[in-house]
């Protein structure tokens, strides 16, 4: 909900659902043991809503990051239309990494925090 608010200025309501239950015209999150990779996910958009399934909570998290990055930058206060489709994604490697050369340059702590954030958010 917070990621959608950041991108659009709109805070969608959050509602808990029972296993197997979905809500129409909503973003539904779920777990799917059939997804092979622990961080893999399937993001499906239709006229009925958005479904993000991951094998684990991490997979759902990365699916949410993909949805967040799919929202146009100029979406603040505007209607958002996403094309219908399905994205199946999983990491190629079991690790994520970036390199920051702290040996030759001094970096303030705040910069390092901003540098590390994309590792978790995938963007």
What is each stretch, according to the model?
Residues 91-123:
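Substrate-binding cleft of carbohydrate-active enzyme catalytic domains
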């Amino acid at each position: 909900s917070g990621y959608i608010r950041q991108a659009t200025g709109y805070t969608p309501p959050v509602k808990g659902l029972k296993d197997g239950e979905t809500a129409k015209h909503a973003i539904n999150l779920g777990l799917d043991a059939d997804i092979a990779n622990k961080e893999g996910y399937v993001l499906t958009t239709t006229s009925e809503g958005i479904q993000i399934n991951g094998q684990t909570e991490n997979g759902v998290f990365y699916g949410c990051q993909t949805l967040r990055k799919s929202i146009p930058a100029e979406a603040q206060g505007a209607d958002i239309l996403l094309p219908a489709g399905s994205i199946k994604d999983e990491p190629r490697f079991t690790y994520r990494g970036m390199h920051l050369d702290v040996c030759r340059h001094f970096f303030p702590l705040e910069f390092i925090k901003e540098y590390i954030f994309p590792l978790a958010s995938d963007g």
